[in-house]
């Protein structure tokens, strides 16, 4: 049944999806230069209300836009105050060259290290494999620095993370990024949720604030896992 499904998907992509994208590219190319709105959503009727709805959907809260802006401003100010206090007590920190352990310069080694390191804070990860793939150069300009491809609900034994080499990021950046996308971030959260009896209907729904909130939170913990 799975093989039939895979074959059908390939057929649909070849006969419908790719031709549809080709037609869309052609149509959008013809429209280049005819746009009359340089102000985004706010310049459309009910644009403000639509934006507010998007904010609520993507954050998962009922805070107003102004309240969210204030929360962000308060958090940033708190971070600045903390950094100022730390630098005042140790000015040399500003010029320190922070580097990862030489054994953690390989992406697969980073994933293996993170998978073990998180056990002091979180339940043991599922028995899964992680494949790290590099974004094709033709797409590097348009894609995020990294992203996790959500595993199928019926088979989360193999997972894939894409890394974009468009920018010359440091090893520490890649380490924290792999924590965000891998362990204990998106990959870990997805597989553990599945193993605990994730309700299938949730695979049809989107919780961007909850999912990205978790990954961003644990990304900050990665500095500790890196031994810094």
Where do the model's predicted regions map?
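N-terminal maturation segment of proteins
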Residues: 1-228
């Amino acid at each position: 049944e799975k093989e039939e499904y895979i074959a059908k998907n390939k057929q649909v992509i070849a006969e419908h999806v790719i031709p549809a994208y080709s037609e869309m590219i052609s149509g959008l190319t013809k429209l280049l230069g005819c746009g009359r709105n340089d102000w985004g959503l706010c310049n459309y009727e009910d644009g403000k209300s639509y934006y507010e709805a998007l904010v609520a959907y993507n954050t998962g809260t009922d805070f107003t836009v102004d309240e969210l802006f204030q929360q962000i401003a308060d958090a940033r100010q708190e971070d600045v105050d903390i950094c100022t206090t730390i630098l005042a007590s140790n000015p040399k920190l500003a010029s320190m060259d922070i580097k990862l352990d030489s054994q953690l310069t390989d992406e697969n080694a980073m994933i293996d290290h993170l998978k073990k390191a998180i056990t002091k804070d979180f339940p043991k990860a599922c028995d899964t494999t992680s494949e790290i793939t590099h974004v094709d150069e033709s797409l590097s300009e348009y894609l995020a620095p990294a992203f996790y491809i959500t595993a199928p609900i019926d088979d989360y034994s193999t997972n894939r993370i894409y890394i974009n080499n468009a920018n010359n990021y440091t090893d520490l950046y890649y380490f924290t990024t792999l924590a965000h996308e891998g362990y204990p971030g998106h990959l870990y959260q997805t597989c553990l949720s599945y193993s605990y009896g994730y309700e299938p209907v949730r695979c049809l729904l989107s919780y961007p604030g909850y999912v990205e909130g978790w990954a961003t939170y644990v990304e900050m913990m990665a500095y500790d896992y890196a031994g810094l």
